[in-house]
Amino acid sequence: MKMRNFFLLILLLPIVLFAGGRPPDRPEVRAIWVTRFDYKSPTDVSSIIVNCAQAGFTDIFFQIRGNGTAFYPSRVEPWAFELFGKDVSKTGTNPGWDPLQMAASWAKRYHVRLHAYINVLPGWRGFDSPPRAAGQLWTAHPDWFMVDSTGARMKPTSAWYSFLNPAHPQVRSHLSQIADELARYDIAGLHLDYIRFPYDYTDVAREVYPNASSKEIKAHSVFSFDPVSLGAMGRSASRRKWDAFRRKSVSQVVADLCGIFKARKANAVLSSSVLADFSTGYHEAFQDSRRWVKEGSVDWLVPMNYNARLFDERLGKMKHALGRRATGGKLVVGINCAGDAREIRRQIEVSRRAGCRGFALFAYSHLFENHQPTVKGEEVIRCW
C-alpha cells in the first residue's frame, strides 16, 4: 500500500510542481527589446545580436518600424530617417543595407530567435513634417489619422506620436501589407507595440495646445471622431457602445496581422506588448488582451509591468484575468531595466514563482553601453 502511494506521488509530482503555471515542456522565454535608437550601422546590429545571444537571451524583439517609416526595404513605407540621425529630411533615403535582414542572419548564426518589432498605430512623431516626396503617411494620407472630439487631426508632439485610426479599412489594409512583407524574412515572429488608443494623450497635449483650458485639453484627447468611425457609430451613440467599437477596431487589427503573418509562417510567434494594468488596458486603451489570447490572435502577451511599486499587484491581476493555463503558456512579463539590478532580479524571480512563460527586459541600452555590458547588465544576467 505504501509502495503504491509512493508511485502515485511520483506520477502526480509534475502536476503539483507546475500547477501554478509554465508546463515543464516549455522552456523559459528570456526576451529583450532592442529599439530603433540602438543601432545605426551594420556593426551595431551584429554587436547587438552577439551580445544578446552570449548573454543567454532566447528571444530578441528587434524594432524595425517606429512611426510610419521602415528599417528594411518596404514597398509601402519609406526608409526611416533615424538611421542617419535626427534629420527628418532624410526620410525615404536608402541607407544601402537592410537592418532586418542582417539581424535575422546574425540571429540564425547565434541560435537566438528574432522577432520583428513594430509600433503598429503610430503614424508620425515630432513637429517637423517629412518631405512630401517620401510619401510618408502624415503627408500622403492625412485622413488615416485619428481625429479628436473637436474635429482636429491628432497632432504629434516633440516626442509623441499621432496615431493611425484602426477602424479605417485602408489603415488595416496598409498594416496587413507590412505584416506580409515581414513574414518573408527568416524570423521567428512578429512583436506588436502601441496597438491601442492613446489614452494618455492628455499628458502631452499641452505642448501643442499651450493656451487650452483643462476642458479643451480633454476634448483634444478623446479619439477618434473621424468620418469612418462617425459613419459607423454616429455622434449620439452611448459611451459604452463607442468603447466597444474602439475595442473591436483594435482587436480586428491584431487578428488581421496575426492572420497575414501566420499565413506565410504558420509556426511563427505573434506577441504583443500591452498595458500592465489589465483594467486600464481594457477600459481606457481598448486592449481586449484576454480576447486576443482566447481567440489565438497572440501567442505571447507581454504586459509592460514597469512600475516597481505596483509590479507584484499588477502581475497578480493580469494572471487572474488570463487564468492559470494562459499564464503558463502565454504570459511573458515585461520588466523595466532602468532601475537597479537588485529590483530587476527580484521581479524576474517573482515572474518565475508566478508560473509565467518567461520575461522580457526593456531594453538593450540599459544593459549594454557602446555594446559593452554594464555593471548592472552583468549582474542581471547572472540570475539565469
Predicted regions: what they are:
Residues 25-30, 39, 121-185:
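Active-site-adjacent "subsite" loops/lids of carbohydrate-active enzymes
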Residues 31-39, 79-96, 158-173, 239-249, ...:
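The substrate-binding groove and active-site-proximal loops of carbohydrate-active enzymes
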Residues 45-70, 185-189, 297-300:
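Catalytic domains of carbohydrate-active enzymes, especially glycoside hydrolases
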Residues 57-94:
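Aromatic-lined carbohydrate-binding/catalytic grooves of carbohydrate-active enzymes
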Residues 72-84, 122-155, 195-233:
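Aromatic- and acidic-residue-enriched segments that line the glycan-binding/catalytic groove
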Residues 113-121, 191-199, 236-285, 329-340:
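Aromatic-lined carbohydrate-recognition surfaces of secreted/lumenal glycan-active proteins
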Residues 122-126, 200, 264-310, 346, ...:
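Substrate-binding cleft/loops of secretory-pathway carbohydrate-active enzymes
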Residues 297-314, 318-321, 327-384:
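Substrate-binding cleft of secreted/luminal carbohydrate-active enzymes
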